[in-house]
Amino acid sequence: WAIQAKSVADKLSEILPENKEYFENNLQTYLKSLDEATKYIQAKINEIPEESRYLITAHDAFAYFAEQFGLQVKAIQGVSTDSEIGTKQIEDLANFIVEHNIKAIFVESSVNHKSIEALQEAVKAKGGNVEIGGELYSDSMGDKTETYIKTIKANADTISNALK
């Protein structure tokens, strides 16, 4: 996001050179906020034991987040939510959850919850137990997360609280 913010500030400064200082000041403020959010999120993720740092969701929308903060993503679907979900995908992921004793899986605000609920039932059928750890915001924001920074911090809180 820092790269995109700089690109936007540069383009606005090009279009409205008389406001360049204003755009640069806002950019620096935003970059500082992003840096603070990054540190906050890393601290929250560090509260989770390393062996529990699995982020399991309906689709693979959190790959970049997970890579940056040291989580492993496992998803029922890939990035697209349009593809069909097969029972084999649910079975394989349920086996993985039981094998790794994963405590929580997550629903997403913009994705139907049925596949995650089916995954939870498949884990129970195998004698395991996994909780739905909360709702994550991937393609949309929630009531209390009207900015990108508030959204990623809320996601970090939800993940950390469920997995630690």
Predicted regions and their residues:
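Extracytoplasmic metal-acquisition and chelation regions
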Residues: 1-164
